[in-house]
Amino acid sequence: MEFSTQQTPFLSFNREQWAELRKSVPLKLTEQDLKPLLGFNEDLSLDEVSTIYLPLTRLINYYIDENLHRQTVLHRFLGRNNAKTPYIISIAGSVAVGKSTSARILQSLLSHWPTERKVDLITTDGFLYPLNKLKQDNLLQKKGFPVSYDTPKLIRFLADVKSGKSNVTAPIYSHLTYDIIPDKFDVVDKPDILILEGLNVLQTGNNKTDQTFVSDFVDFSIYVDAEEKLLKEWYIKRFLKFRESAFNDPNSYFKHYASLSKEEAIATASKIWDEINGLNLNQNILPTRERANLILKKGHNHQVELIKLRK
């Protein structure tokens, strides 16, 4: 098999080249298993899972085995058998690119691996500041930007998980109310693998050498990519679907959008993209792409067309 060997830190594969790397890994997901894993606006097929995610699962398992071997060597050197360290995978990318779907599919595939590893999934949405604080600090228009997250709290969470603590809690975010759910938590209890999904999980500081970042705790990082034109198109399409469903819920923070005409809804979604999501993409998210260990570049119909793997 041939792949790109240009002077770049990445190896590049098209779909066919990448699919060959699946080897004999069986697909244990069925169409019925796949449906609950899909995002609101995605129609991802089992073929996509076989072509893209099975080879990726195989690769990640090799990395995890190597990581466990390294831990064994360290324990032998130190003369003590410390608690097993969870392997942390981060998934970054823009709003509407399909990060959550990728995360759920990976969680399912890695959980069904013959080694029966325990795989937990947490999104960084739970570490957004509460809505009242964002309003108070005049940050509502910056929601999703790095400044809108309680990063120290997220760092403490990751440090506790990485150190092998039991029953580490993470806040839960509601997309319906657009806010943190009071007194509700996800519990992470010594997983073999933790998948962390969020917009800004690849970020580092600007020459701040004494600061700890989310990326410091990550063993393998994935960036889900697509051209901005497609991202905006997918965002508007998703907005229109929400207008006909979730926005009609009386508890929805966005219920005022339910009465918009289709033309008004498209204009509103386009404005939100240009002023918030697109801005965040170009200022904060896209600049972190090249730090990833793996880049999945999507084309039309949410299909991955190009895979870039760090050498």
Curated annotation (Swiss-Prot):
Binding positions (ATP): G93, S94, V95, A96, V97, G98, K99, S100
Q: What is its main location?
A: cytoplasm
**SUPFAM superfamilies from the entry?**
P-loop containing nucleoside triphosphate hydrolases
Known pathway: Cofactor biosynthesis; coenzyme A biosynthesis; CoA from (R)-pantothenate: step 1/5
Biological process annotations from GO: coenzyme A biosynthetic process
Q: Where is it localised?
A: Cytoplasm
Record's PANTHER family?
Answer: URIDINE KINASE
Family membership noted in the UniProt record:
Belongs to the prokaryotic pantothenate kinase family.
Q: Which NCBIfam families match?
A: panK_bact
Record protein name field: Pantothenate kinase
Origin organism lineage: Bacteria, Pseudomonadati, Pseudomonadota, Gammaproteobacteria, Pasteurellales
